[in-house]
C-alpha cells in the first residue's frame, strides 16, 4: 500500500476582524462561536495580552506602553536627534541667515587669519573658445535680424573719375570667338589603368592579339623548314652511310 504523501500547508491566514467599531486591543479579547462571526469582548487592562490568546492574535494586539518605562533617547548612541519644536523650525517666509565668506571677519571686514581668495579665471583656451563662440552667435543674431548693425566693410579711398574717351568704351567688351577653328587630334596610349577600367574583355582581346602576332612570327621562322624541299634534304641526310644499320 502506497504511503500517502503529506500535503504541505502554508502559514495560517489571519482571522477576519470583528464588527465595525470593535478593534482588538490589549483591553479586548476576540472569541468566536461555532457558525457565528467573531465577537470582541472587553477584558480588564493588563501589562500584556491575555494568556488565552494565540500567537497570531498576540501579534495583532496593541499593548500600550506603561508609564513606569522611562526610556530616554540619550541612552542610545545611534538614536536620531530629537525633532525641533514647531517654533524653532525655519519657515519659507523667514530668510535664513547667511554665513559670512571664509575671508570675512566677524564684523564684515577682512579677516587677517584667512588670505584673500583669488578671483576665478578660466583657462586661456577655454576663454578664447567662449569669446569666439559669443562673437559668432552675435553675428548670427545680427544676420537673422536683417543685417541691422552688421559691421560694414572698410571704405576705400575715392578715386578721381576719369572722363570717358572714344578709345576706351564705357561698357566692357564681350568675349568674341574666332571663325577659324583648328582641331588637333591627340594620340593617347592606353595604359594599364585604362585597360583595368575598361574591364577584363579588353585585356583578353589584347592577349589574343599578342598571341596571334607571336604565332605569325614563329610561322615565318619555322615555315621554310617544314616545306617539301626541306623534308627531302632531311631524308637524304638521314639515309647516308653513317646512319645505315
From Swiss-Prot:
Residues 155-172 are annotated as: 6 X 3 AA tandem repeats of A-T-P. GO terms for molecular function: protein serine/threonine phosphatase inhibitor activity. Keywords: Host cytoplasm, Host nucleus, Host-virus interaction, Inhibition of host autophagy by virus, Inhibition of host innate immune response by virus, Inhibition of host interferon signaling pathway by virus, Inhibition of host RLR pathway by virus, Interferon antiviral system evasion, Modulation of host PP1 activity by virus, Repeat, Viral immunoevasion, Virion, Virulence. The keyword Nucleotide-binding does not apply. InterPro entries: PPP1R15. GO terms for cellular component: host cell cytoplasm; host cell nucleolus; virion component. Residues 187-245 are annotated as: Important for interferon resistance. This is Neurovirulence factor ICP34.5.
Amino acid at each position: 500500500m502506497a504511503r500517502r504523501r503529506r500535503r504541505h500547508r502554508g502559514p495560517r491566514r489571519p482571522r477576519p476582524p470583528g464588527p465595525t467599531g470593535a478593534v482588538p486591543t490589549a483591553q479586548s479579547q476576540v472569541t468566536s462561536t461555532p457558525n457565528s462571526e467573531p465577537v470582541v469582548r472587553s477584558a480588564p487592562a493588563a501589562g500584556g495580552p491575555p494568556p488565552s490568546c494565540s500567537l497570531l492574535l498576540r501579534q495583532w494586539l496593541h499593548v500600550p506602553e506603561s508609564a513606569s518605562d522611562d526610556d530616554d533617547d540619550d541612552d542610545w548612541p545611534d538614536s536620531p536627534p530629537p525633532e525641533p519644536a514647531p517654533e524653532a523650525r525655519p519657515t519659507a517666509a523667514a530668510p535664513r541667515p547667511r554665513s559670512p565668506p571664509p575671508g570675512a571677519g566677524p564684523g564684515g571686514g577682512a579677516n587677517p587669519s584667512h588670505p584673500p581668495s583669488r578671483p576665478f579665471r578660466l583657462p586661456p583656451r577655454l576663454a578664447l573658445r567662449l569669446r569666439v563662440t559669443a562673437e559668432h552667435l552675435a553675428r548670427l543674431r545680427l544676420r537673422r535680424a536683417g543685417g541691422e548693425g552688421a559691421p560694414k566693410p572698410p571704405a576705400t579711398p575715392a578715386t578721381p573719375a576719369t572722363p570717358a574717351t572714344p578709345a576706351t568704351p564705357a561698357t566692357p567688351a564681350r568675349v568674341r570667338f574666332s571663325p577659324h577653328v583648328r582641331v588637333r587630334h591627340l594620340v593617347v596610349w592606353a595604359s594599364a589603368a585604362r585597360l583595368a577600367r575598361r574591364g577584363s574583355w579588353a585585356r583578353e582581346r589584347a592577349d589574343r592579339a599578342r598571341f596571334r602576332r607571336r604565332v605569325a612570327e614563329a610561322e615565318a621562322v619555322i615555315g621554310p623548314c617544314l616545306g617539301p624541299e626541306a623534308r627531302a634534304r632531311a631524308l637524304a641526310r638521314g639515309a647516308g652511310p653513317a646512319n645505315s644499320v
